[in-house]
Amino acid sequence: MAMTDPLGDMLTRIRNGAARRKSSVSTPASKLRARVLDVLQAEGYIRGYSEVEFGNGKAELNIELKYYEGASVIREIARVSKPGRRVYVSVKSIPQVANGLGITILSTPKGVMADHQAREQNVGGEVLCSIF
């Protein structure tokens, strides 16, 4: 059966893996997922990720989760824009997460980026998810 929300599935795998204190989780690979993971890594929410290719043309992303003193660095991770209800914002209305302690990840014409980068580049876009 086809997956209706691949990005939402990846975020759920990360949330569940962190709740179970897993060292890593895996998810099917896609360009959008890899770009979101790049932002999560740059912002310090995951240790890193690697892409593993299989012989049948399929690939998987292995995500290394990050912990601080035994607790997950990610307290909350939520999908904002969903397949049935897309959420677009201008640069002036980019939401702040936890009064600036968390980040919002956006898909913009200039690529996938965190909220503070979008404000610096003066660009809005689709709000993919929020992390705290």
UniProtKB/Swiss-Prot annotation:
One of the primary rRNA binding proteins, it binds directly to 16S rRNA central domain where it helps coordinate assembly of the platform of the 30S subunit. The gene is rpsH. GO terms for cellular component: ribonucleoprotein complex; ribosome. InterPro entries: Ribosomal_uS8 (IPR000630), Ribosomal_uS8_CS (IPR047863), Ribosomal_uS8_sf (IPR035987). Part of the 30S ribosomal subunit. Contacts proteins S5 and S12. Belongs to the universal ribosomal protein uS8 family. It comes from the Bacteria. GO terms for molecular function: rRNA binding; structural constituent of ribosome. GO terms for biological process: translation. This is Small ribosomal subunit protein uS8. PANTHER family: 40S RIBOSOMAL PROTEIN S15A. SUPFAM superfamilies: Ribosomal protein S8. It comes from Rhizobium meliloti (strain 1021) (Ensifer meliloti).
